Amino acid sequence: AFLKDQHETVLLNPDFTNYLHYNLLFKCKIIEDKNPTELMKAIKNDIQIDHLKACHINDGIAMTKFMYWLKKNVGKIPMTERMISDHLEEERKKLPDYMGPSFETICAYKDHAAMMHYQSTEESDVDVKAEGMLLIDSGGQYYGGTTDVT
């Protein structure tokens, strides 16, 4: 908002600037172009690549342990969508660089799997059995990067 009374030069991408903000800059000289840092941020250096590899390997370890637990126990012990989601979170918490989920885990069984961005609640949580489809979309935030696994 402070720019509305300025006579400065402003670089903006009109594809990502809403009408209100664009019009607040009427006294400014506007240069329409892409953000020059976008390409620089898209190219990872060797250290960033190494960190991303490490976090994906570690997340893969947590996912493998989780999948083993799930396959070994589904249909043998009581489990619900929320219990399964919680168990996956516990596996990730065992990892040294784990900081938390990168987004809320979607654990959707049978009909719930067809609902986009479904989130299990106390009311909607259902028992999971050794039949039908179980969709899990989850991710972890690690010191070296972020994962997203479906």
What are these language model-derived features?
Residues 1-150:
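Active-site neighborhoods and metal-handling regions in enzymes and metal-associated proteins
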